[in-house]
């Protein structure tokens, strides 16, 4: 049995979207599991729409998700001579022909077919034409078999059959001389030795046409596996109106790559009831056998749940590095990344995304606290002056600024004043971070440090009654 060779072949006309990322992951994981080869091909034959910016964005997104190719990127735009040679081969063998029908003529044929209740398809006007008119624009069409059927075994969906009479003569070269998608993809997959084409099921209708081309060109036909689509919550095809569809948009929103990878692979594939997988587990367990045959629904809440898990269980040092980037985007430069680690530890259980964590971490760096208006109105009142004075006095005499020591000081203030915990902790929390939620009050004080803690308590007292 030959070694597995799979490919991911995006078009560089935009960013890598969720559906494309999942297709790439399925190919990547299968190649890694079977010690095969993962090829990256950039399908940039549409020169007008293809951009280097899009290529860079696709490569960046794949790198962020941890996907490295074994071969490539290979650019179709570098292979036009090969495509032209293969088209010439088909024409010389009588398997393709020039079609001089104009767009207006083709539209009339389409309308006539619709009026007669027939499926619109090219009627073969130029199929047997012997004359060659070099001064007239033309396309080149593949001479498709008109009888019989084309059947292939889809490794996800099973046997699929198309009646050849339903398929028309496919255009393989446009009037400007450029080859079309269905032609170049066959040539490339064959020339690159791709023996499994794993892609979205929106390509199923292309498959019989491509199989015909493989056979006409004398190439072996690869295996095919078509992955069901990803739908939005309303069961329509996933689009921007369902939320972000660009992979890198999720990075900007504070998602971890391992969370997105875990979620996307589980979107259509399963291994029992297991929800959370390490990269090694995905590589070991992934197979086509457990890919479902029906479409999957994108669930943002499930992705957030997974992201929360990976933040909660993540390495604080790594998360600190990532958090620094989000803080920098918010105008907060962290001189020493190590200073962020205790903040990360304090916020890991409370953060759904890194953006969420960055918003909560702002209070530890800001010179001016942004007070929650309701919290300030409730707790920064004259009746609580003695609370701040008692806590400030006790903290002034504390030299060992560690959480456990501060906890002892805090309990001492509770005992001395007779206050219940909330009556002391909530006013103090509002004074220190601007609101009533956050980590433990003593951990907040440890992270802020002695000078900043005392300054904020003093600042809160100056606001009392305002």
Swiss-Prot record:
Catalytic activity: tRNA(Glu) + L-glutamate + ATP = L-glutamyl-tRNA(Glu) + AMP + diphosphate
Residue span of motif 'HIGH' region: 10-20
Enzyme class: ligase
Keyword annotations: Aminoacyl-tRNA synthetase, ATP-binding, Cytoplasm, Ligase, Nucleotide-binding, Protein biosynthesis
EC number(s) given by UniProt: 6.1.1.17
Function: Catalyzes the attachment of glutamate to tRNA(Glu) in a two-step reaction: glutamate is first activated by ATP to form Glu-AMP and then transferred to the acceptor end of tRNA(Glu).
Molecular function per GO: ATP binding; glutamate-tRNA ligase activity; tRNA binding; zinc ion binding
Gene Ontology annotations of biological process type: glutamyl-tRNA aminoacylation
Protein name: Glutamate--tRNA ligase
One GO cellular component term: cytosol
Assembly behavior: Monomer.
Pfam name, any one: tRNA-synt_1c
Residue numbers covered by motif 'KMSKS' region: 237-241
